Amino acid sequence: MSRISKAEMSKLLSVYFIMGSNNCTKDPLQVLREALEGGITIFQFREKGEGALTGEERICFAKELQAICKEYGVPFIVNDDVELALELDADGVHVGQDDEGITSVREKMGDKIVGVSTHTIEEARWAIENGADYLGVGPIFPTSTKKDTKAVQGTKGLAHFREQGITIPIVGIGGISIENTASVIEAGADGVSVISAISLAESSYESTKKLVEEVSRSL
């Protein structure tokens, strides 16, 4: 197995759904299924914050979600927890700046997908040099899902990454909705990552379909 190519990674980032049990008001397994039917291209398991599952329950829930992703042939990524990603033989892991260092993550994950959240050009360059396959850049817009976010960057912040010669695949993160998706892609992102735009939508299926349409229209 070799590392994923830039072109393949770029395609996978199109509509990146992130979810944990506490991000849904409906059955999360049903929400994920609808999102997959609607066309998400990659999924990240992020079980964090108030009311999040822990221990064995968390692992069992992750396995259920992973099995559904497998049915649809969509990569299953674990947020932050490298050990869980290895235990589940997940397709990859996504880490932030305060999580385990990228060098040791890459070492442990082998050729699997490694994504890194970055807020500055320096962080981006460090992540690229040490084995990141893609960057999560944001928050682009204000978000209520994550309580520990850095300052909002806007689409200008994202465009700045491209202007500074960062060519690695980038997914925009933070406060992204159907209405503002086009502006994120136009600023230079390969895709958008969303939580509530899908998890809290009246129809997760319809919402995903609209996101997919917006991304392909703007690319």
Swiss-Prot record:
It catalyses: 2-[(2R,5Z)-2-carboxy-4-methylthiazol-5(2H)-ylidene]ethyl phosphate + 4-amino-2-methyl-5-(diphosphooxymethyl)pyrimidine + 2 H(+) = thiamine phosphate + CO2 + diphosphate; 2-(2-carboxy-4-methylthiazol-5-yl)ethyl phosphate + 4-amino-2-methyl-5-(diphosphooxymethyl)pyrimidine + 2 H(+) = thiamine phosphate + CO2 + diphosphate; 4-methyl-5-(2-phosphooxyethyl)-thiazole + 4-amino-2-methyl-5-(diphosphooxymethyl)pyrimidine + H(+) = thiamine phosphate + diphosphate. Its EC number is 2.5.1.3. 4-amino-2-methyl-5-(diphosphooxymethyl)pyrimidine binds at residues 44-48, 79, 117, 146. Mg(2+) binds at residues 80, 99. It holds the Pfam family TMP-TENI. Binds 1 Mg(2+) ion per subunit. It is an enzyme of class 2 (transferase). Gene3D superfamilies: Aldolase class I. HAMAP family: TMP_synthase. NCBIfam families: thiE. Belongs to the thiamine-phosphate synthase family. This is Thiamine-phosphate synthase. It comes from Bacillus thuringiensis (strain Al Hakam).
